[in-house]
Regions:
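Loop-helix junctions at membrane interfaces
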Residues: 1-168
Length: 168
């Protein structure tokens, strides 16, 4: 894919990442933490535009959204920047390395999500003195519906795009 097309797609994915939380009801605690509306477009970006651009999208989207509407709050946005950048980077790299094998979409998705959660936990330990229990409860327990949604939705969308030959 030409760089111009990749950059255009990256800008579109960034816009989707920033705007998609508006689609959900405005209860950010319930829907923001549980369904993780900014996470899914970043994961999709890893497959569509590649690891480096997906990492940039993940790193800047929470800050753009914070500056635009004040949500997520800065205390949440900073760890999210690291988490989403890791999502994009690791998912894209693992997919590229293993794309010649079967199940590479699911494998790269799991690797990216796990790496992103680990980075998110480390940043929250440093910034907010989170304990292991807090990381497990907030990072995996509260986010479980979003994780399930991403595990279903991301492969479905990517397989669909591959089928209509929009991505490799």
């Amino acid at each position: 894919m030409k760089i111009t097309k990749r950059l255009l797609l990256a800008v579109i994915m960034l816009a989707i990442t920033v705007v998609i939380p508006f689609i959900l009801p405005q209860n950010h605690i319930l829907f923001g933490k549980m369904l993780q509306p900014m996470h899914t477009p970043v994961l999709l970006s890893a497959y569509i535009v590649g690891a480096p651009l997906a990492a940039v999208i993940g790193a800047v989207a929470p800050v753009i959204r914070h500056r635009w509407v004040g949500m997520p709050t800065l205390e949440i946005a900073i760890p999210m920047c690291f988490e989403l950048a890791t999502y994009g980077l690791v998912t894209g790299i693992v997919y590229k390395i293993s794309s010649h094998r079967g199940r590479s979409i699911v494998k790269s998705l799991l690797a990216g999500m796990l790496a992103g959660r680990v980075v998110w936990g480390i940043v929250n330990v440093v910034m907010h003195n989170y304990t292991f229990g807090m990381i497990m409860a907030e990072g995996f327990g509260n986010a479980f519906p979003g994780i399930v949604l991403q595990m279903f939705l991301v492969p479905l969308i990517i397989y669909g795009l591959k089928k209509i030959h929009k991505i490799k």
